[in-house]
Regions:
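Residue(s) in the substrate-gating loop at a strand-loop-helix junction
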Residues: 158
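The beta1-alpha1 cofactor-binding region of Rossmann-like NAD(H)/NADP(H)-dependent oxidoreductases
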Residues: 50, 54, 71-84, 114
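Canonical Rossmann dinucleotide-binding motif of NAD(H)/NADP(H)-dependent dehydrogenases/reductases
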Residues: 2-36
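A glycine-rich helix->loop->beta "capping" turn
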Residues: 6, 63-66, 86-99, 105, ...
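Active-site helix of classical SDR
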Residues: 132, 174
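Substrate-binding pocket helix/loop in short-chain dehydrogenase/reductase
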Residues: 108-109, 113-121
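C-terminal helical subdomain
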Residues: 198, 218-299
Length: 299
């Protein structure tokens, strides 16, 4: 198999189902060697099942590609390190890390339990930190040893994290953290030949079933298929994307866009008198753009 990712070794978390599976299959189709990570739990993070990751490995091998399965819980820092080491030990190198694993425990803030908050932050935010921390340390050591590195980190944020969505304070906070993590890690790791980008996907998967997306018309469903998210991730994983880092890409079958992030808006000269702040804020708000809706458009 050959393609734009020929010979590149990719670790993909949460790759047993949904979007992650599409990444694994397309990257393998473009010549990458894949570590298919998946704990195999349900969409709330409960349970374990090795078969989803193993099934994707079998699909890749049937295509003529190379892949191995990994069942690590990415929220476990030590297990995340072992996953990265597995890639290096088995394939002899590591070129790409795709942090995709995730769960949902949606709840209105006033009803959210501490465990629902902790679980989502753990899988999404810590589950991005752990693999990235270990991969980054590996690449840094290669550079210190005189080797040239051309590596990629591809994280997964969400419109809920960069724009907001009701009922997802835990999920949105985790995804907003991942967006910031992406920008900052891009700054820190550029010196080692590592780029860091993220995608904010919109697709119909088992995680979106309770959001009413299953009730969409067939044309819309087709445009929201997970397959549409894989091309940008595959390109970002390739050597062709070398000059792109610190960016968030919003993607569905209908649109590929760059999320422009926070920018300073209108400004005024401040005052040290709190009784004079009201008119200044009113002036600022009159000139400022409104917050975007959950699709990134002005309200």
């Amino acid at each position: 198999m050959s393609g734009i990712c020929e010979g590149r070794v990719c670790v993909i978390t949460g790759a047993g189902r949904g979007i992650g599976r599409e990444y694994a299959l397309m990257l393998a189709g473009q010549g990458a060697k894949i570590v298919v990570n998946d704990l195999g739990g349900d969409m709330t993070g409960e349970g374990e099942d090795a078969s989803p990751a193993q099934q994707v490995v079998a699909e890749i091998e049937a295509m003529g590609g190379e892949a191995i399965a990994n069942g690590a819980n990415v929220a476990d820092f030590e297990a995340a390190g072992e996953m990265i080491q597995q890639a290096v030990d088995h394939f002899g190198r590591l070129d790409v890390l795709v942090n995709n694993a995730g769960i949902l425990r949606d709840r209105m803030l006033v009803n959210m339990a501490e465990g629902e908050w902790d679980a989502v932050i753990g899988v999404h935010l810590k589950g991005t930190f752990g693999p990235t921390r270990h991969a980054a340390a590996h690449w840094r050591e290669l550079v210190k040893a005189g080797e040239t590195v051309d590596a990629r980190i591809i994280n997964t944020t969400s419109p809920s994290g960069i724009y907001g969505n009701v009922g997802q304070t835990n999920y949105g906070a985790a995804k907003a953290g991942i967006a910031a993590f992406t920008v900052i890690s891009a700054m820190e790791l550029e010196r080692y030949g590592v780029t860091s980008n993220a995608i904010a996907p919109a697709a119909i998967t088992r995680m979106t079933e309770d959001l009413g997306m299953g009730q969409l018309d067939e044309e819309t469903k087709a445009s929201m298929a997970p397959h549409w998210i894989a091309p940008i991730v595959t390109w970002l994983a390739s050597a062709e994307s070398k000059g792109v880092t610190g960016r968030i890409f919003q993607v569905s079958g209908r649109e590929l866009a760059v999320a422009e992030g926070w920018h300073k808006g209108p400004a005024v000269t401040p005052t040290d008198d709190p009784t004079e702040i009201g008119p200044l804020v009113a002036e600022l708000m009159a000139d400022a753009r409104p917050n975007a809706d959950m699709f990134g458009n002005d309200n």
